[in-house]
Amino acid sequence: MLELSYPVLALDADIKMMAWGGDYDVIFSKLQSWGYKKVELLIRNSDTVQVDLLTEKLQEYNLGLSQIATGPMQRMDHIFLMSPDSLVRQTAVKQLYGLIELGSKFAGVR
């Protein structure tokens, strides 16, 4: 069965995107009431995601995490794997490893 997912900005991603940013309680309670089952987390930096808070709020509102996306990282810090700058690519690879580790922390969340 198809489950609805909605993009939500991590707390450190203060940028205008096609995603909902702000207080997790406000966002997650609305998404839950509208029938959403999961959120897509848009992050700026894998090291600054408040894992305990996010896990607690996802569980409180019975929501899962469908994916982790890097739009804010690319738009705010210009970090991406295809950069012509080798230093930027190295930073992107470091962040990619952080994303994998971050994703593993949510394996048991709904």
Regions found by a protein language model. Name each.
Residues 1-108:
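N-terminal pre-domain/capping segments
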